[in-house]
Amino acid sequence: MTCFQTIAVIGAGAWGTALAAVAARAGRDVTLYARDADHASHIASARENPRLPGIPLASRIAVTADLARAARADTVLIVVPAQHLRGAVMHVAPLLAPGTPLVACAKGIEHGTHKFMTEVIAEAAPCATPAILSGPSFAHDVARGLPTAVTLAAPDEALAAALVQALGSPTFRPYHSTDVRGVEIGGAAKNVLAIAAGIVAGRQLGASALAALTTRGFAELVRLGRAHGARSETLTGLSGLGDLILTCAGPQSRNFAAGLALGRGEPLPAGKLAEGQYTAPVLVELAAARGVEMPVAQAVAAILAGAVTIDAAIEALMLRPFKAEE
């Protein structure tokens, strides 16, 4: 198994730049790819990404708009939003050496196909080896070198362990796993549940309500994960419970911020949609196909679709039939 000395990061946003810093701290030679040549040139000359201000780029990070140059790396991190993953992978796929690990660093489910991130990679780049990195991590914390732990999953345990060795450092601790689907479900479900948490905060329903919502939401995440064969230790680990706790903690999460605006009756934050807005209806359909009850996720999907008011959704959740806790 290769030591993955060279690592490319496709996507020069805040999260991509933070992961480039992670790889550099781990002693790897890093290529950070930006599709926009002007953006790449600015980062390269300023040695700072305006999307991650105050964080100087390490000397080991080269910045380029040349995708072929990035594709020569031993492993490639794909750091683009979930709904843009297929396009990014299709562009880089013809340039990759056979078997190159492609690590998805997005959390979500592809709209329209209902495919998880590693499934998208497998379809768009059959020559590559899919993997997934997920867990409780905000870009600015990671870029600053604050202690962070995540999960990195691949079907082959030796590959997952080698990727962990390539990225791990005293400030960034990945745990390896072969439970790819469990990791993906945790990342996708928590986006939707974070919108619900934001709504609770925006409505000023109190800390007790937020705790109840987070706990019952986690029960939904676990039910869906188990229906897809996920392992309990994955769902209760960093990529499941850990990420849910972080994302429900405050407006630094784009999904929580979207829910907060909804709860306050304000327009949704300008710019890109929160990933949970795409994922909510897909998550509900996946749950229905497996006979899994996800009332909180259903409520979020209905609110986003304009099918129910927030107050009516809250009332419906509170008036569900009483039952034993599970």
Swiss-Prot record:
<keyword id="KW-0521">NADP</keyword>
<keyword id="KW-0547">Nucleotide-binding</keyword>
<feature type="active site" description="Proton acceptor">
    <location>
        <position position="190"/>
    </location>
</feature>
<dbReference type="InterPro" id="IPR013328">
    <property type="entry name" value="6PGD_dom2"/>
</dbReference>
<feature type="binding site">
    <location>
        <position position="255"/>
    </location>
    <ligand>
        <name>sn-glycerol 3-phosphate</name>
    </ligand>
</feature>
<feature type="binding site">
    <location>
        <position position="15"/>
    </location>
    <ligand>
        <name>NADPH</name>
    </ligand>
</feature>
<keyword id="KW-0443">Lipid metabolism</keyword>
<feature type="binding site">
    <location>
        <position position="107"/>
    </location>
    <ligand>
        <name>NADPH</name>
    </ligand>
</feature>
<keyword id="KW-0963">Cytoplasm</keyword>
<dbReference type="GO" id="GO:0005829">
    <property type="term" value="C:cytosol"/>
</dbReference>
<keyword id="KW-0520">NAD</keyword>
<feature type="binding site">
    <location>
        <position position="107"/>
    </location>
    <ligand>
        <name>sn-glycerol 3-phosphate</name>
    </ligand>
</feature>
<feature type="binding site">
    <location>
        <position position="137"/>
    </location>
    <ligand>
        <name>sn-glycerol 3-phosphate</name>
    </ligand>
</feature>
<feature type="binding site">
    <location>
        <position position="35"/>
    </location>
    <ligand>
        <name>NADPH</name>
    </ligand>
</feature>
<keyword id="KW-0560">Oxidoreductase</keyword>
<dbReference type="GO" id="GO:0006650">
    <property type="term" value="P:glycerophospholipid metabolic process"/>
</dbReference>
<comment type="pathway">
    <text>Membrane lipid metabolism; glycerophospholipid metabolism.</text>
</comment>
<keyword id="KW-0444">Lipid biosynthesis</keyword>
<feature type="binding site">
    <location>
        <position position="275"/>
    </location>
    <ligand>
        <name>NADPH</name>
    </ligand>
</feature>
<feature type="binding site">
    <location>
        <position position="254"/>
    </location>
    <ligand>
        <name>sn-glycerol 3-phosphate</name>
    </ligand>
</feature>
<keyword id="KW-1208">Phospholipid metabolism</keyword>
<feature type="binding site">
    <location>
        <position position="190"/>
    </location>
    <ligand>
        <name>sn-glycerol 3-phosphate</name>
    </ligand>
</feature>
<dbReference type="GO" id="GO:0046168">
    <property type="term" value="P:glycerol-3-phosphate catabolic process"/>
</dbReference>
<dbReference type="InterPro" id="IPR008927">
    <property type="entry name" value="6-PGluconate_DH-like_C_sf"/>
</dbReference>
<dbReference type="InterPro" id="IPR006168">
    <property type="entry name" value="G3P_DH_NAD-dep"/>
</dbReference>
<dbReference type="GO" id="GO:0046167">
    <property type="term" value="P:glycerol-3-phosphate biosynthetic process"/>
</dbReference>
<dbReference type="GO" id="GO:0005975">
    <property type="term" value="P:carbohydrate metabolic process"/>
</dbReference>
<dbReference type="GO" id="GO:0047952">
    <property type="term" value="F:glycerol-3-phosphate dehydrogenase [NAD(P)+] activity"/>
</dbReference>
<dbReference type="InterPro" id="IPR006109">
    <property type="entry name" value="G3P_DH_NAD-dep_C"/>
</dbReference>
<dbReference type="InterPro" id="IPR036291">
    <property type="entry name" value="NAD(P)-bd_dom_sf"/>
</dbReference>
<feature type="binding site">
    <location>
        <position position="253"/>
    </location>
    <ligand>
        <name>sn-glycerol 3-phosphate</name>
    </ligand>
</feature>
<feature type="binding site">
    <location>
        <position position="135"/>
    </location>
    <ligand>
        <name>sn-glycerol 3-phosphate</name>
    </ligand>
</feature>
<feature type="binding site">
    <location>
        <position position="273"/>
    </location>
    <ligand>
        <name>NADPH</name>
    </ligand>
</feature>
<dbReference type="Pfam" id="PF01210">
    <property type="entry name" value="NAD_Gly3P_dh_N"/>
</dbReference>
<protein>
    <recommendedName>
        <fullName>Glycerol-3-phosphate dehydrogenase [NAD(P)+]</fullName>
        <ecNumber>1.1.1.94</ecNumber>
    </recommendedName>
</protein>
<comment type="similarity">
    <text>Belongs to the NAD-dependent glycerol-3-phosphate dehydrogenase family.</text>
</comment>
<dbReference type="GO" id="GO:0051287">
    <property type="term" value="F:NAD binding"/>
</dbReference>
<comment type="function">
    <text>Catalyzes the reduction of the glycolytic intermediate dihydroxyacetone phosphate (DHAP) to sn-glycerol 3-phosphate (G3P), the key precursor for phospholipid synthesis.</text>
</comment>
<feature type="binding site">
    <location>
        <position position="243"/>
    </location>
    <ligand>
        <name>sn-glycerol 3-phosphate</name>
    </ligand>
</feature>
<dbReference type="Pfam" id="PF07479">
    <property type="entry name" value="NAD_Gly3P_dh_C"/>
</dbReference>
<feature type="binding site">
    <location>
        <position position="139"/>
    </location>
    <ligand>
        <name>NADPH</name>
    </ligand>
</feature>
<dbReference type="GO" id="GO:0008654">
    <property type="term" value="P:phospholipid biosynthetic process"/>
</dbReference>
